[in-house]
Amino acid sequence: MSAVTTDEIWPLKVLLDTLRSLSSRTSPTEPWGATATAEARAAIGSFFLASGTMSILQVELTWRDTFSAILEVYKQTRSPEASMLAQNFVGLILWRISVRWDKTSWQENSHRLRRLVAEMTGEEAISWLSRNNLRISAPFGPSVMWPLISEWFAVFEDAANHAFTYTPEHLLSEREFSFNVGDLAASLAHKRFELIYDFPFVQEGIRLVSIASGWIAPFVIMYRCTTNRVFTPLTRILFTIALVDQYFRGLHAPQPFQIKDRFAEDVGALGSKELIPALEANSTKRTSYEVRASAAIAYESPFVHTIQPGMAADKLRNGSDIIMSDTSLTEDSLAIHLSAVLRLISDIGLEEDNGAIDAAKAKLSNSARRAWDAIQYSSSPKQLLEALIERGFVRQVCRAYESALKTYFTRNYGSVDEGDIFDDVQQVVGCVAVIGNVVFGLIESYGPGMTYLSNYMENCVISESDSHFIEALGLERAIISQIIGRCIPPIPHEDYIKAARAVLVAEMDHVASKSEAVGFRQSIRSAKESLMLWFDNRANEIWGIVPPDESNVLNLDANLPNSDYSNVDSNVEQDEFDGERESEMIRLASTIRYPEPMPITPESTTPHFLKYIIATVCLDALTSVTTAIFSTPRLGTALKVLTWARDYGMPYLDSFINHRGKLNALISAIIPFTQDISNAPTTDDALNIEMLLGELYDVISVAISMLPQEARPFLPPRPDPSNSNVLISMHGTALHLQLNYLAERTFDCVEHLSNKSKQLVVFASIFKDFFTCKFVSGISGGTVKLYHHSELHSSLGTWKIFDVMTAIRELYDSANNIIADIRLDSMKLRTIIEETGKQLLLCDDIMEQANALGQDAVKLFSVLGADFAGLTRLQNSLDLHIRKLTSCNTPPGMQDICWLLGRWSILSEINSTYRDRSSHELVSAIENVGGVLQDMMDHDLASIGTDDKSVAGEIEFAVESVMRDYPVITEDDTTLVVTLSSRHNLTHRDEINFCTLDIETIAPDDVDLTSFARDFITKQRVTADALVNIIDTVFNTGRRANGDNA
């Protein structure tokens, strides 16, 4: 734990320093005077209001001295505030201790905190209370806190030890393991701990245990899927790979034999329906997931992620056939096959028959719809996880599917209506994936604490950038909230918070009832108000609990009107008040000076004096803020005045229309800009402070209207940018920072779009140079030779036509992906344009209001407005160019590439009817599209100065760029030969080399028969008699078998 610096302050130290200062000014043998008593009560009231937190070390350093000083205050003054704080010291301090634990530090830090609690509730503290005749059984006192907290720590340590004991490897050895999400964390929020539930260390313990155990339930469900014999072997294999990738990834991760053995057994059951043989698979490209799956299957181990160089491996089938197979994948868990589903929902690389694709999509849609139905019927975390995981929607695939669909969405956004972008299978898979991502993002912090509550609020709110995507899926935000709210809702135990508040109120009332003096009763009301203001603000910020009505109502003396203060007649005489006493109050109000405390007199401690305090002290505080320039030193000074105004009269006087709450809110809004210079203000911050200043202004206005006419101070106009330095300077700072921020975002967007556009030009140039080549049919069927268009004697290489077309499609798809990225960036740019437009309007509005502050302020916002307008023009110009770039259905310069690929798809469907004739037709088609593309490229690239003729180096670079991943075919290459095996049969006529049938056998003229003499003499030969005997044996055996049957 870090050391405490000498200039560091925290609430307990501030209280200690104030009480020490008071003690140093008074004699220990003499009773304290009214002024010292008032200052002590004010100090305790300020501590009740303090919103700061403390570390364990800070409390260790100061709690004894502070506790002793509070007891000294009580001994000298018998004030109820000191009694309340001393008797409930333990709870009120622990409520302010902030802790942060992790897997390695929780034991040491929790033991340290436990020792601190033991000291604060030990014999020494109890004896101090007893000597002063104070209770030790107060609700937050030592006799109540120590048993409760020590029991909680015992439960916490047991829960944390259990949570961190569980490991994936440990759970594999459990025969039957049943675990409900949140069980361990729920024990830390039992009803018996409701009094300390809101304490920060309790919430930190709940957070730690929730995160430490949140992975267990998903792991158990997924592991169960890897061993479920109802699933097919391939389904179990894919679940096992997902399990290993999520829970056993890393250099030192264990490799349990149970998983290895079952995986190897399942791999042995795979056949040609699930795998493509290595010889055929090596000529095709694989995604990273397919490489990972192929490596695991080849080595029969899910812990192998890559294929060793030079090794051939079978490839997992990912076409529509694997989806349609009744024996390969379990029908309810088709989503676990990541690569196959991605191909169907992305429409990438689909070259099968349209009917087969439609059938596969329909089957996948039905499978995903059953998952969606199961989600709809779920009502608990376990049921929801089972509905997702058992149907193949594990964490990895949900992320991949949502990402793929977002890419697809941006590629098609704007070209068709939002409702028509996705087909049925994309919508249902997307809906389940979106829900899955939300669930997996929440489940690992699921628990009854504030951490899960904040995560829940963040994850269930769909960002504006995703709103169009969610709507295109047909998924409503209300449905997401309904499902999550039904299955894994937050459990914040608001009743515990309200019960703790009720206990605090009851304790304050009990202390007040024991007070004999009227002044003490009034002061405990003020202390109660301060403590409740702190508690209610905290409950609202952390838990979102709106304070009870009674905490916000006016708490004035019955002599003061408490209805509509806007209609108060200031000339109405107050009951029991004479002119002399009123004059004395006016005189006292005129002597109020910052930072002096309130003078203690009969007139100043009456509730009637409160309106004078508001009209002077609060008006000074308001003026100090509105006249300050937005800077750390000036705001620091204003903050001190605000704090002084909030605490003024606290021991004796209640709030006036909740003025202390409004001052406290203003303090909270300003503090961030006085503590950390890196906190940049926004226009929303400025508007918030303007609103808070307005609320305080209304309170001051009411108080002034209640004063006698001759005593009313001048009330300035309501604070706004036209009359407030802090608002105009804060708006100016915020708008300047926002201009820089939006300009930086625009620059990043421009830079990214520029790079993407350059890539498109490179791709277009590569296609242009590539199609200037001469394409000639190779000697081997299904191949094509590439030549320089003007140098036919120099071949650039021979490739399979299938490889050439695949390479062209990949490059074209890469260009399409770039267009999709550009469309996505264009959506971000439009968001930036909207934000810039809003800031421009705000800038103009403030410029009009700034007229009253002089021409310098007007000029500042005029220049800012011109800068915003210039940025807007730049953004709109860029947006116009992007719209032109993305308005086509194909990347620029590639329309005929799209036409060629479309024709190739048609030819692929009927390719079985073609032999060499198909090769010639494809060569002709390629030559034709090359000529068309050349004309098109000459036109499209003229603006960037591209030469009309491609030089040899450019052509070679283009061919290398397109075909770099595909092997060159030589004349004697055997790669076209397909080996028949149990895992492969000929499915395509292009796989057969028919040229062999056309080659005639011609005997050489110079056959040397003597070269065969050695073999003829030395090797054993089969004689004719031996052959006859074998044939007779076979036939005779057949006859006898027939005779026996007869």
Swiss-Prot record:
Chief location category: virion
GO cellular component, one term: viral tegument
Lineage: superkingdom: Viruses
One BP term from GO: virion assembly
Record keyword Acyltransferase present: no
Keywords, sorted A to Z: Host cytoplasm, Host Golgi apparatus, Host nucleus, Virion, Virion tegument
Keyword GTP-binding tagged: no
Region feature Interaction with large tegument protein, mapped onto this chain: 543-1046
Subcellular location, record wording: Virion tegument; Host cytoplasm; Host nucleus; Host Golgi apparatus, Host trans-Golgi network
Coiled-coil intervals: none
Quaternary structure annotation from Swiss-Prot or TrEMBL: Interacts (via C-terminus) with the large tegument protein/LTP (via N-terminus).
Family: Belongs to the herpesviridae inner tegument protein family.
Free-text function comment from the UniProt entry: Plays an essential role in cytoplasmic secondary envelopment during viral egress. Interacts with the capsid via the large tegument protein/LTP and participates in its transport to the host trans-Golgi network (TGN) where secondary envelopment occurs. Modulates tegumentation and capsid accumulation at the viral assembly complex.
Entry protein name: Inner tegument protein
Organism name: Gallid herpesvirus 2 (strain Chicken/Md5/ATCC VR-987)
Lineage: Viruses, Duplodnaviria, Heunggongvirae, Peploviricota, Herviviricetes
